[in-house]
């Protein structure tokens, strides 16, 4: 399985896509790169409310205080959006996550204006849930 790119490479790759069909395919590819989420982590505590699709996000804090994220969805495009969020929050502490605004990155990728309203709401729900959980750990 290929590793996820860093923030800058994600943005470059996104900008290299010729059209939105290519961007959607790239988002799906990113989702396919996520590590498999085990069945024990697919429970209501890790479920994200406000998403039309099933979404699970697991947050664990490692010994260095850095948050490690795992997630999955039953929808390919949503799984790709999870991957994008994970790329943006990669190697951050809980306080870093609380303080970091992902919206400028979404604007640079022109991401939200090309998502359906329900997917945009689901993306916002994921971000709110991650930030809320990070706030309890910081």
Swiss-Prot record:
It comes from the Bacteria. Homodimer. Interacts with SufS. One of its GO terms (cellular component) is cytoplasm. It is found in: Cytoplasm. Belongs to the SufE family. SUPFAM superfamilies: SufE/NifU. Disulfide bonds: none annotated. NCBIfam families: PRK09296.1. InterPro entries: Cysteine_desulfuration_SufE, Fe-S_metab-assoc_dom. One of its GO terms (biological process) is sulfur compound metabolic process. The active site is at 51 (cysteine persulfide intermediate). Pathway: Cofactor biosynthesis; iron-sulfur cluster biosynthesis. The keyword Cytoplasm applies. It holds the Pfam family SufE. This is Cysteine desulfuration protein SufE. Keywords: Cytoplasm. Participates in cysteine desulfuration mediated by SufS. Cysteine desulfuration mobilizes sulfur from L-cysteine to yield L-alanine and constitutes an essential step in sulfur metabolism for biosynthesis of a variety of sulfur-containing biomolecules. Functions as a sulfur acceptor for SufS, by mediating the direct transfer of the sulfur atom from the S-sulfanylcysteine of SufS, an intermediate product of cysteine desulfuration process. The keyword Cytoplasm applies. The lineage of its organism: Bacteria, Pseudomonadati, Pseudomonadota, Gammaproteobacteria, Enterobacterales. Gene3D superfamilies: 3.90.1010.10. Signal peptide: none annotated.
């Amino acid at each position: 399985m290929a590793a996820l790119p860093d923030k800058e490479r994600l943005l470059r790759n996104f900008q290299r896509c010729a059209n939105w069909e290519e961007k959607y395919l790239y988002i799906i590819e990113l989702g396919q790169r996520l590590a498999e989420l085990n069945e024990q982590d697919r429970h209501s505590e890790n479920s994200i409310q406000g998403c039309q699709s099933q979404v699970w996000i697991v947050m664990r804090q490692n010994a260095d205080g850095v948050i490690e994220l795992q997630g999955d969805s039953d929808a390919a495009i949503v799984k790709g959006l999870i991957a994008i969020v994970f790329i943006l929050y990669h190697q951050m502490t809980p306080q870093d996550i609380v303080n970091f605004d992902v919206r400028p990155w979404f604007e640079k990728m022109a991401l939200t204006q090309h998502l359906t309203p329900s997917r945009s709401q689901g993306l916002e729900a994921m971000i709110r849930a991650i930030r809320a959980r990070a706030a309890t750990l910081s």
